[in-house]
Amino acid sequence: MKKLNLTDKRNPDYFYSEAIKTLRTNIQLSGQSIKTILITSCYPNEGKSDVVLSLAQEIGSIGKKVLLLDADIRKTAYAGRLGVEEEVKGLSQLLSGQVGLQEVIYSTNFPNMDIIFGGPSAPNPSGLLSENIFKVFLKEIREYYNYILIDTPPIGTVIDAAVIGRCCDGAVFLIEPGNVRYRDAQKAFKQLERSGC
C-alpha cells in the first residue's frame, strides 16, 4: 500500500466541527454491525464530499480505522482537492479489471485513514457499480476497517447511490437548507430507501 501526504486546506469553524463529531457519535451509537456507510445528497455542490472527508478524519482521530471510498466514478474530485499531484489509481480501474485491490488503496498522513480515489471517469458508472465485483470488493475490505465511508454521486440526479446502497449497512443523506425543494428531497430519500439502505 502506497502512502500519500494529503493537504487539507479547509479551516472548519467550531459549529461545523461539532456537527461532524455529533454525526460520528450517532454512527457509533448505531451499533458495530454498521460499518459500510453510504453518504449522498440530493444535488451536486451541497458539501457532501467535505462532510465525508471531515467525518473520515474525525473517525480516524479517535483511533478507528477508516476507509474513505470515492465512489463517484463520474466526477471524482478528491485527488485535486487534497493536493495529490501524482497519478493515482482508483475505483473505476479496479471495477473494470485494470488494476488489483492493493493498487488502489492509499494510506494517508491523516491518522488511521486510508483512501480509494474514484479513478478516471467510467463510460457506464451505474453498470460497473452494479456488477458483483463491487459487492465482493466491499465484503473483502470490510474485514480491515472499522468504518468504510462511501462518497457517492447525488441520488437526486443519477442512480449510482441507489445501486451502491444495496451493499451498505446504512446511509447519511445530506440536504443543503434553502437549496433543495421538499418534493425533490422526498423523492431522493424514497429512492435511497428502495435500495434497502
Question: Which positions does each model-derived feature cover?
Answer:
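Conserved catalytic-core segment of NTP-binding enzymes
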Residues: 126-197
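Short phosphate-binding/catalytic loops that engage adenosine nucleotides
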Residues: 64-65, 197
